[in-house]
Every structure is written in C-alpha cells, then in structure tokens.
Amino acid sequence: MALQDKGILEALLYTAGDEGLDQQQLLEILEIEPTTLTELIEAYDSPGLTIQHYGNTYVLTTKKEASDYIEQLIEQKSKMKLSQAAMESLSIIAYNQPLSRSDIELIRGINSDGAVKTLIARGLVEAKEEADSRSHQLYTTELFLNVFGIEHLDDLPTTDEEDEEIEAFFSNLVNQKGDNHE
C-alpha cells in the first residue's frame, strides 16, 4: 500500500464532502481489493481528520478533539452575511426542493459545495438521504421559514410577482444574523 494511495483516498473523500463515497465506488476508483481499502482506512492518520464509516459509506470528518474550536468558528461565521453564491443556492433550493448538490450546480453552472455547506451550517438547509437514491436531497428547514417570517413554502413569492419583491424577500437574509433562531 503506497503513501500515494492514502493521499488519493483522502482527496476523494474530501471532494465527495458530507455525502461521502460508498465502498464499491472507492474500490473501483482506487482499483484495489476490499482488504487493501480496509488497511488504507485503518492506517489513515491525520492530526485533525478521520475517516468515518456509516453503513456502506465512508466520509472524511474532523476529529472530536477539534469540536470546540470548530463550534467557535461556525458561531463566528454564522454572524456573517451570506455570499451571493449562498443566496442563489438558497433560492434555488427553496423554489425547487428537493434537489441534490449536482442539481444546484447544473442550474447555477458552477460548483456550489461551499455555498451549500454554509447553508447547512447555518441551519437554513438540511440534507436528507433518500431511500431510492445514493445522493442526499436538500430541503429548506423550519429555521428558513422563521427567518423569512413565513409559515409554508407556498408563502414564497412566485415568479408571477414582481422581480423586485422576490429580490427584496431574499435580500432580507443577507441582513440576518445566524443567531436569530427564535
């Protein structure tokens, strides 16, 4: 087992994000046997990261020792405004849910992982695993409804309404602080 294989495994899981990769995908991409994959995972040693096994899926995660620091970072970031990419992704999810990350990228025409991770970290969007799909589907949360002061998704402005009203509706989120969870 080469050091290069460990790096490739880490890069693959990092790229896959919180959806991870299942064992079969890893075996095919790395062109290795199951025992070699097990050895690679057991030998993986990073000061801040670990490989978690959930069912048949492997995910690169942070180690528990870093959780307090990560919480501080998330708290600081949640007080910051949403980026334009996050706003676009949020509106796409709100109007078209459920969607996968790849659906959002197809609509936006650009990688949206960072924006989606921000929305999930702020509690505005959640990823749910669908029984008939290997990918997670993205949905808005109750917090999303609360932030916008609506009770149901049906209360979102429709595209039949003025574009300014829709723009104003979503620009409210830019001014929201992440700690308004009431």
UniProtKB/Swiss-Prot annotation:
<comment type="similarity">
    <text>Belongs to the ScpB family.</text>
</comment>
<protein>
    <recommendedName>
        <fullName>Segregation and condensation protein B</fullName>
    </recommendedName>
</protein>
<dbReference type="InterPro" id="IPR036388">
    <property type="entry name" value="WH-like_DNA-bd_sf"/>
</dbReference>
<keyword id="KW-0132">Cell division</keyword>
<dbReference type="Pfam" id="PF04079">
    <property type="entry name" value="SMC_ScpB"/>
</dbReference>
<keyword id="KW-0131">Cell cycle</keyword>
<comment type="function">
    <text>Participates in chromosomal partition during cell division. May act via the formation of a condensin-like complex containing Smc and ScpA that pull DNA away from mid-cell into both cell halves.</text>
</comment>
<dbReference type="GO" id="GO:0051301">
    <property type="term" value="P:cell division"/>
</dbReference>
<keyword id="KW-0159">Chromosome partition</keyword>
<dbReference type="InterPro" id="IPR036390">
    <property type="entry name" value="WH_DNA-bd_sf"/>
</dbReference>
<dbReference type="GO" id="GO:0051304">
    <property type="term" value="P:chromosome separation"/>
</dbReference>
<comment type="subunit">
    <text>Homodimer. Homodimerization may be required to stabilize the binding of ScpA to the Smc head domains. Component of a cohesin-like complex composed of ScpA, ScpB and the Smc homodimer, in which ScpA and ScpB bind to the head domain of Smc. The presence of the three proteins is required for the association of the complex with DNA.</text>
</comment>
<dbReference type="GO" id="GO:0006260">
    <property type="term" value="P:DNA replication"/>
</dbReference>
<dbReference type="InterPro" id="IPR005234">
    <property type="entry name" value="ScpB_csome_segregation"/>
</dbReference>
<keyword id="KW-0963">Cytoplasm</keyword>
<dbReference type="GO" id="GO:0005737">
    <property type="term" value="C:cytoplasm"/>
</dbReference>
